Design a protein with these regions (language model features):
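Alpha/beta-hydrolase superfamily serine-hydrolase fold, recognizing
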Residues: 1-165
Length: 165
């Protein structure tokens, strides 16, 4: 499980664990929870353009965060940022092979939502059992700003645990 950039890390660690086959036993992974993942890319999406001046997550801030965190010389189409590029996109089928479920959360006021939905679509195309939780109008990280609004995350956790049993 991961929130924001932690969701990106959870996806990458999950895929690496899936590649390990049975070498991680007795550890049993049942699924991944990607809470408002921090995906990006070089080409601007409609949501990024529409919400470029978002008060919580303006596009200049996301660009700067990626510039500071990606490997030297990499752009925002690096697989750490854009999971639809590189090895990650081809590896999503491993999640299905392992029988894992994936739960995602997103919100309509998030400039990153188009990329989140793109990854959800790719997972569904690979046959992965996906539970997608969506809140209209809220911004990226809204539940951190107002913890009383963390219900979406709690529902996602509950549903993922319930499905994975």
């Amino acid at each position: 499980m991961g929130t924001d950039a932690g969701a990106n890390i959870a996806l990458h660690v999950g895929l690496r664990a899936a590649e390990c086959g049975d070498n991680l036993k007795p550890l049993q992974i049942k699924g991944l929870i990607l809470h408002q993942p921090f995906f990006g890319g070089v080409e601007r999406t409609p949501a990024e353009m529409r919400l470029a001046n978002n008060k919580i997550l303006p596009i200049e801030a996301t660009d700067l965060m990626w510039e500071l965190s990606l490997p030297a010389g990499a752009d925002r189409n690096h697989e750490y940022c854009n999971p639809m590029k590189g090895k990650v996109a081809q590896s999503l089928g491993l999640i299905k092979e392992k029988g894992w479920n994936v739960t995602t959360t997103s919100c309509g006021g998030d400039p990153l939502i188009d990329r989140q939905k793109e990854v959800e679509k790719a997972l569904e195309e690979k046959g992965v059992t996906l539970v997608s939780k969506y809140v209209d109008g809220e911004c990226h990280g809204y539940d951190l700003l107002e913890p009383s609004k963390a219900e979406l995350l709690m529902c996602a956790l509950k549903d993922t645990v319930h499905i994975s049993r």
